[in-house]
A protein has these predicted regions:
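Iron-sulfur cluster-binding electron-transfer modules in prokaryotic oxidoreductases
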Residues: 8, 14, 18-271
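Short, exposed "boundary/linker" segments that immediately precede the start
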Residues: 2-9
Length: 271
C-alpha cells in the first residue's frame, strides 16, 4: 500500500492537503526529511503524523512521506519469520535508498521501526550496502530535532508551558543508545518539568495483546503505572503509542491519559 493512503483518505488536515503543500513551497528549507509513516502511524493514529509534520514545517524542514512502504518487519522478526523479514526488507530498502541518494534524512514515529532500520536489519544483513546506507540516514524524530538544536537551527520560541510531564522511555528506544532525546527537547520548554520513567511497559510487541499473556504484561507495567499515578502530572507520554495505551489500561486514580510527545511539542509551539 502507499503510505499516504491512510492519512490522505481523511478530510484535508492541518498537516496535509493543498494549503499545506502551498505553504511548503514558500518555505526556505534548512534540511530534508522523509517520514517512514509505519503501519501504526498510517492506520491507527494519523493525527500523530500530522503533528510531526507540523513540527518539522515550523522548523523549516522540507518534509515528505515515503511514497511506498510495507511493515518494517519487526513483528515478523519477533516471531522468527526471517523469510518475511527479508521480503519486507527487499521492498522497503529500495524505496528508502532513493531518498538517501537525494540527501534526505529518514525518521519514523515508532521506536520499534526506527530500531529495525538502525540496528536489526544491519545486523541481519551486514553485507547489504544499501541497508547500511539507510541505517546511517535513519533517526529517531527527537534525535533529529536535537541535531537541529546543536546546529543552532531548532526553533525554541515556545508559547505554552507543559507543566509536570511523566515521560516513559520505551525499551525499543532505549536500546538505540541515543540518550533521552525526547526529554532533552521537551525540557527546553519554559516551566516544563519532565520525570523520566525507564521501565518496561509490558507491551513487548504483540505480547500484551495475546489473551494468555495480557495479565502478565499488566503486572510488568505496574511500576510504570504506580509512578505516574503518584507523580501529580499534567501529562504523561511515551514515544511508543502502544506502550502509552498499555499504561492507559492500568491507570485508575488520575484523569489524564497518554499523549504523543509530538502532540505536546506542537501545543508548546502553538501551531
Amino acid at each position: 500500500f502507499q503510505a499516504e493512503d491512510g492519512i490522505r483518505d481523511r478530510s484535508p488536515s492541518r498537516g496535509l492537503g493543498d494549503v499545506y503543500k502551498r505553504q511548503l513551497e514558500k518555505t526556505a528549507y534548512k534540511d530534508k526529511v522523509a517520514i517512514f509513516v509505519t503501519c501504526y502511524g498510517n492506520r491507527n493514529e494519523p493525527d500523530v503524523i500530522e503533528d510531526l509534520i507540523a513540527i518539522l514545517k515550523h522548523n523549516k524542514i522540507e518534509t515528505k512521506l515515503v511514497k511506498q512502504e510495507k511493515c518494517c518487519g519487526m513483528p515478523k522478526m519477533e516471531l522468527g519469520d526471517l523469510e518475511s523479514v527479508e521480503s519486507l526488507k527487499n521492498f522497503n530498502i529500495p524505496q528508502l535508498m532513493e531518498l538517501v541518494e537525494d540527501n534526505y534524512n529518514i525518521i519514523a514515529p515508532i521506536p520499534s521501526c526506527v530500531l529495525m532500520f538502525k540496528k536489526e536489519l544491519p545486523l541481519l544483513f551486514p553485507d547489504d550496502e544499501s541497508v547500511q546506507k539507510v541505517k546511517n540516514a535513519f533517526y529517531d524524530p527527537f534525535e533529529f530535532l536535537m541535531s537541529l538544536k546543536k546546529d543552532g537551527n531548532l526553533n525554541t520560541k515556545f508559547i505554552k508551558s507543559l507543566g509536570e510531564v511523566a515521560y516513559h522511555a520505551p525499551c525499543h528506544q532505549r536500546v538505540q543508545n541515543i540518550g533521552p532525546k525526547t526529554k532533552d527537547i521537551l525540557e527546553l520548554i519554559p516551566n516544563t518539568n519532565i520525570t523520566l520513567i525507564e521501565r518496561c511497559s509490558g507491551h513487548n510487541g504483540t505480547y500484551a495483546v495475546k489473551s494468555e499473556y495480557h495479565e502478565i504484561s499488566m503486572k510488568i507495567c505496574k511500576p510504570v503505572i504506580s509512578k505516574i499515578e503518584t507523580s501529580n502530572v499534567d501529562h504523561y507520554i511515551s514515544d511508543c503509542p502502544m506502550a502509552g495505551h498499555q499504561i492507559d489500561n492500568g491507570v485508575q486514580n488520575i484523569e489524564v491519559r497518554s499523549e504523543s510527545p509530538f502532540t505536546l511539542l506542537r501545543e508548546a509551539y502553538g501551531i
